[in-house]
Amino acid sequence: KLDDKTYKKRLSEQFTVYSGNSDLYCLFFEKGNDLLNKNGCLAFITSNKWLKSMYGDLLRNYFLNKCEIITLIDFKALQIFKKASVDTSIIVSKKGDFKNLNACQIESLNEYNNLEDTIKSKSIQTKKSILSGPWVINNKESLNLLEKLKHLENRIFFKREQFRYGIKTGLNKAFLIDDKIKKILIQHDKKNIDIIKPVLKGDNLNRFSFNSNKHFLIYIPWHFPLHNEGIKGASNKAEQKFKKDYKILYDYLFKFHSELSKRNKSETGISYEWYALQRAASTYVNDFYKPKVAWMNMNRGWKFVYVPKNYFIEASLNFIADDYYAKYLVGIYSSNLHKWYFKQVGRMFDDGGFMCKVDTISGFPIKYFA
């Protein structure tokens, strides 16, 4: 039996469409196309997640360079199969040079029951020039607007790595505290004030603003209080120093010792100490001390908020920190135009919520202003 690392290595060597988080059905497209003869056609019914997901990027590029797509049907969130909850697509392709994408969306059972007529009446040709990112299937007016946005002049380009994830504690009830506990911990040891940070949680968010319910984070990075990048793995020396120098905090967290030790078992007590945050964002901790724009990963109200300096961010939220553009970005991201744009290129929940992953938000077209 192959271990996971070897398994992934072999797949990456054999398939150009494979990435570490690819769904295996993507590999069947490439293998099927390789096996086709000159006049053969390939038809697959699969999940439609490849159309917009990050892992589908390699597959979309493969189609653009290796295939002629005859028909693509996106059923969006329409549930076609009675015994399988899956968002579905159908694609028919053959070997050859990619031409314009001939595709249509089907969003109701009535359209599905008259499939041939629906394909004829709703199919739209999409230019290759706007298929560099997620594939969008829509009417001509929407595609024209999308193309204008994608080729917006004087754009602000933020690097993908500037978009950050919030801190993952692994056990919120241990690390997220209220004002009462904060005051007790600081009263017993004044230096704890440097460890306890104001934090923003997802349930604090309104549109454009947030409720300050006085939540605080006990910020304990790996190997705290030692600051030695050479430390590999959980350090008993770090724990003993933490117990000695921050006894009140140590005793408080020790009340959760059993639950904290049962977090990610492949890392807790191995890569980091039982009392440390699971993901402390140590490589970009300075961003928490800047103005920020924050939003929920599962964003059901299209909420983006301005977050002042010194607020830390919890894992249900993503954010981007920028001293100059933060307030401007809140207005841009919150606009109806960008809400519409997301619906074209992003992924939605079945209840209409927005799956606001970093990979989608980081691709938003933003107009530069001086």
Where are these regions (language model features)?
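Active-site-adjacent structural elements in folded domains
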Residues: 28-29, 278-280, 346-351
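Basic, amphipathic alpha-helical recognition segments used for DNA target recognition
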Residues: 66, 318-363
